[in-house]
Every structure is written in C-alpha cells, then in structure tokens.
Amino acid sequence: MRLVLLGAPGSGKGTQGEKLVAHFGIPKISTGDALRAAVKARTPLGLHAKAAMDAGDLVANEVVYGIVEERLGQPDAQKGFILDGFPRNLAQAQVLDGMLERLGAKGVGKALHLHVSDEEIVRRLLDRAQKEGRADDTEPVIRHRIDVYNAETSPLLDYYGKQGKLVKVEGVGSLDEIFQRIVDVLK
C-alpha cells in the first residue's frame, strides 16, 4: 500500500495515520520526521539540511525532495508507506510521482482525504489550543490556515481524483468509527 494522507489541520490525519501504521504494519513518513532522521544520520542531504536550519534558513525544496526519496527507498518502505504532510500541492505530487518511478514503484496507490467541515476544524483547534495553552491559535489564525490548506490542496484532490486514486472519508465521529471507515475504503 502506497498511501498519501490528506486532511486539513485538525482533521485527525495524524491520529488516524498512527492507527493505520499499527493496522497495516507499514511506516508513516512525514517530511519533518524524514528531515530530522537524515540530519541525525548525517547523510549528505541531511548535512545540507542541517546547514540551512542552523543558519535559520528554510531547507531548499530539492533537499527536502532528496530526503523524502531517500526515506522512501529504505527497506521498511518497500512493502508500502503512508505519507503524511507530503505532497502538499500539485507540484510536489508530480515530484513524488518521479521519485516513485525512479524507485521502481508504480506510483501512489491511494490518496485518502479525511474530510472535516471548516466549522468542525475551527472547533477542534480552538479546543486543542485551550487545552494546550496555545494562545496564538485564535479563530482568525485557524481560518487562515484552513484557507491556505484549501487553496493548496484543491488542485491536489483534482489530480488524484482524475487518476481514480482519491478516496474521501468523513472525519467526524469517534476515533474508531472514523478508522473503520478508512479501513473499509482501503480494502
């Protein structure tokens, strides 16, 4: 299974992604985790990333792409993977397709979109901000994050939809109900 996990901030994709890891026994790969692992392992790309981060700069896209490709090429990802947080836009999806082709994979198997209404996301994130004492997560900031996500992700949903790879799951309900919906559509 080669799965791209899509969902707005607060949609529950992180939680459901962990449940999928346990259920299917394949790794969940996030760009942040892959970046930290490459830096820790002191790979050539990891050293480039570390230099940028130490200077307070953004890590160049090409370095991020290389690190993701390195991670996808590791033995534990050969039988499948769950990508969380990548791709974020159409250009990254096209880069991902090239990576998978170079690695001998047949591309993304499914793109799972965990759909939650904007109002529910606002409610969840405000609740989380209050519980975690995150004063910077105000409603206007949250709505802006949702708008940015929607603008970036809409073409991505179309891209995977046209390929017949997009599956949408309603992300409201108990954790177990949502997970069962996900497992059902991935069968």
Can you describe what each PLM-predicted range is?
Residues 1-187:
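Glycine-rich phosphate-binding loop of ATP-dependent small-molecule kinases
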